[in-house]
């Protein structure tokens, strides 16, 4: 979702409709759904594309809380990564601080204020390295 760039449905309307219908059905059925992107495919940026994925999951029927879990605790559990996915002592502590409340409005995940990687705050200019 870049300013001035048409949404994906403009280019692939039938493909997107089918994918949205499939995800909607899986959500209703209670299937285990994780976030995922096509990065590093052309036009798909690391990080930013996860925010778009969260927005699509909410548009397809997940609550914001379910979508956030799909990107964190559910994904960690699915890949047997017991040191991440939750905020509690002993965990890896890769964290985002955002302005707003993404459990109510998933768009607030884009309002990043600060980032911690393995418990250490990352300075903004080095975050892309």
Q: Which residue stretches match the model-derived regions?
A:
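His/Asp/Glu-enriched, well-ordered alpha-helical/loop segment
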Residues: 1-101
């Amino acid at each position: 979702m870049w300013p001035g760039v048409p949404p994906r449905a403009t280019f692939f309307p039938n493909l997107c409709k089918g994918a949205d219908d499939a995800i909607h059905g899986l959500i209703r059925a209670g299937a285990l759904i994780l976030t995922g992107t096509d990065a590093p495919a052309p036009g798909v940026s690391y990080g930013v594309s996860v925010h778009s994925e969260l927005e699509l999951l909410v548009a397809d029927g997940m609550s914001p809380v379910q979508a956030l879990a799909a990107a964190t605790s559910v994904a960690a559990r699915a890949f047997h990564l017991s040191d991440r996915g939750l905020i509690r002592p002993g965990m890896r502590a890769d964290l985002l601080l955002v302005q707003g409340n993404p459990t109510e409005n998933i768009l607030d995940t884009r309002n990043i204020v600060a980032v911690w990687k393995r418990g250490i705050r990352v300075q903004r200019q080095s975050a892309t390295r």
